[in-house]
């Protein structure tokens, strides 16, 4: 299946998909260019084992915590730590003297995500997270006491201190996956997602991703240096051509010091912004993304959808032009005889039919005219300005797929509070200036993510394929069994969600497995006694986490002389 934004889905013909009217329809019964399918955030798929190899035994000592990347569990724990630190230095507050650290979030979904990561290190006893327009997660003291020992973190108010990044992330040996998670946390905090801007009375300007921070006048140079370091980190993750905007005084600072001498900038705050070009929007979504901010992720998905449509239409247009040239030898004939007329109408029709048989035509705007063919093949002009009224603007596209409210809705619900410390107040005011005035992508009272509705423009038989989505190497998402299911990058939360549903809430259980024969061993952790009754092994065991039902199933099978074994590396 090819959807109207260019994304593709490979499935069996009797695979059920959820339509925009909340009914399940088999793929073979879909009405092309009419039926709309529900879809949501589609995250890239990564090979965890390959990334562990890429990290090549990297490790970091943080207080009493040793972060490593040798095993899957250690690797996931290290990624979680990088995400937490990325958010802490942007939308967080740390006080070394009081030994406290807090994280500021915009939605309860994000709170659950951060708690899952914190749980890898220690349990959190916090139950109330709401304060004014924010959700606050207080990092447990056990973890905070280790974090404050990390070099390069600022304690107290960050706005009037030198801008810097943690030392471990600036180390040339720091692996790309860890940098990716750190940047994801940073952009989840002080990053800015796609925005629909006004242009000539219409909301048709779609902005790209950016990142900003504020410092007082005397610390502007350090902030500039910090942003240059961020540019280098982005480049390591494959994001290039970023630009840093000149410092600009914040409106909050202007209002606060409006009666002060304008020549005295000592106490004024200036914001520095790093911009990603629109060409890097899709690469940013695929290679980094936002962590701990469902609102930004949701808008990014819609922005990527529109950007993908434009890029795919350009690609199809150029393919059609080149195919017409192959059929008619247009360029060759014109180079020999510029005045000769070369018929192209039938060739264009033939090329379009060929395209429809292979992948489907996304939009009629991709079909070239004879004038387009002349411009591209003879004059060398490029396609992609999208000035025609027949091609949808960003606002029209968002409205069509049901994502416009993600950019327009005003979902501010101030909460009544009795007291707030200075740091929380400062963060709240900063939030109100930068974020809360805009529409929120996910309704704050919702416990689920919204979906987009995309038309199916093409359905093509691709022959035998693996029926299990997990065996497909390409990026896919699909709808099944009444829920939205995805192949997601572990860092975007899918792996943690799967672990929660299949292990944490399913009577989680731990066993010690004999590394020699794979049988579950008898053990006493308190006394450190382990014994395999099958091979009398007493020294070589592996710790394995499985659902209790799985352990019970193994024991039932053993009573029937069927012996399941858990072989570990």
What would you call each of these model-derived segments?
Residues 1-487:
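Internal intein/HINT superfamily modules and their associated LAGLIDADG
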Residues 237-240, 248, 488-569:
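C-terminal interaction appendages of subunits in large macromolecular complexes
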């Amino acid at each position: 299946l090819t959807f109207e934004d260019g994304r593709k889905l490979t499935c069996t013909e009797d695979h059920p998909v959820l339509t925009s009217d909340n009914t399940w329809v088999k793929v073979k019964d879909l009405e092309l260019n009419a039926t709309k399918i529900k879809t949501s955030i589609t995250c890239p798929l990564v090979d965890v084992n390959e990334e562990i190899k890429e990290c090549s035994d990297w490790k970091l000592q943080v207080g009493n915590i040793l972060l490593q990347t040798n095993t899957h569990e250690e690797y996931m724990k290290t990624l979680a730590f990088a995400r937490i630190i990325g958010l802490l230095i942007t939308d967080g507050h740390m006080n070394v003297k009081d030994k406290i650290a807090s994280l500021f979030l915009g939605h309860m979904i994000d709170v659950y995500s951060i708690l899952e990561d914190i749980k890898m290190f220690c349990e959190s006893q916090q139950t109330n997270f709401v304060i004014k327009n924010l959700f606050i997660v207080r990092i447990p003291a056990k973890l905070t006491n280790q974090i404050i020992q990390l070099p390069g973190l600022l304690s107290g108010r960050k706005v009037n201190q030198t801008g810097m990044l943690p030392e471990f992330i600036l180390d040339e040996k720091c692996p790309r996956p860890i940098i990716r998670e750190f940047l994801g946390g940073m952009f989840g905090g002080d990053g800015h997602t796609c925005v629909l801007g006004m242009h000539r009375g219409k909301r048709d300007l779609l902005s790209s991703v950016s990142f900003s921070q504020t410092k007082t006048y005397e610390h502007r140079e350090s902030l500039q240096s910090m942003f240059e370091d961020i540019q280098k980190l982005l480049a390591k993750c494959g994001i290039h051509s970023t630009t840093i905007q000149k410092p600009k005084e914040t409106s909050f600072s202007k209002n606060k010091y409006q009666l002060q001498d304008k020549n005295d900038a000592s106490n004024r705050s200036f914001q520095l912004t790093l911009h990603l070009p629109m060409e890097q929007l899709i690469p940013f979504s695929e290679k980094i993304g936002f962590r701990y901010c469902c609102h930004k992720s949701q808008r990014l998905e819609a922005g990527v959808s529109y950007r993908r449509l434009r890029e795919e239409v350009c690609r199809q247009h150029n393919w059609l032009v080149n195919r017409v040239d192959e059929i008619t030898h247009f360029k060759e004939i014109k180079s020999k005889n510029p005045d000769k007329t070369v018929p192209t109408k039938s060739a264009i029709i033939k090329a379009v039919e060929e395209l429809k048989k292979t992948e489907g035509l996304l939009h009629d705007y991709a079909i070239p005219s004879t004038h387009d063919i002349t411009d591209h093949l003879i004059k060398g002009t490029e396609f992609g300005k999208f000035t025609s009224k027949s091609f949808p603007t960003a606002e029209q596209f968002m409205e069509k797929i049901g994502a416009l409210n993600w950019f327009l809705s005003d979902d501010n619900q101030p909460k009544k509070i009795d007291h707030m410390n200075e740091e929380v107040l400062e963060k709240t005011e900063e939030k109100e200036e930068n974020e809360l005035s805009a529409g929120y992508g996910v309704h704050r009272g919702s416990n689920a993510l919204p979906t987009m509705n995309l038309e199916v423009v093409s359905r093509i038989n691709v022959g035998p394929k693996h029926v299990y989505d997990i065996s497909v190497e390409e990026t896919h998402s699909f709808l099944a069994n009444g829920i939205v299911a995805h192949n997601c990058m572990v860092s975007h939360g899918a792996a943690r969600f799967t672990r929660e549903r299949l292990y944490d809430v399913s009577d989680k259980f731990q066993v010690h497995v004999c590394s020699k024969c794979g049988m579950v061993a008898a053990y006493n952790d308190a006394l450190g006694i382990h014994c395999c009754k099958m091979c009398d092994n007493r020294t070589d065991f592996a710790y394995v986490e499985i659902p209790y039902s799985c352990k019970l199933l193994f024991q039932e099978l053993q009573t029937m002389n069927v012996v399941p074994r858990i072989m570990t590396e």
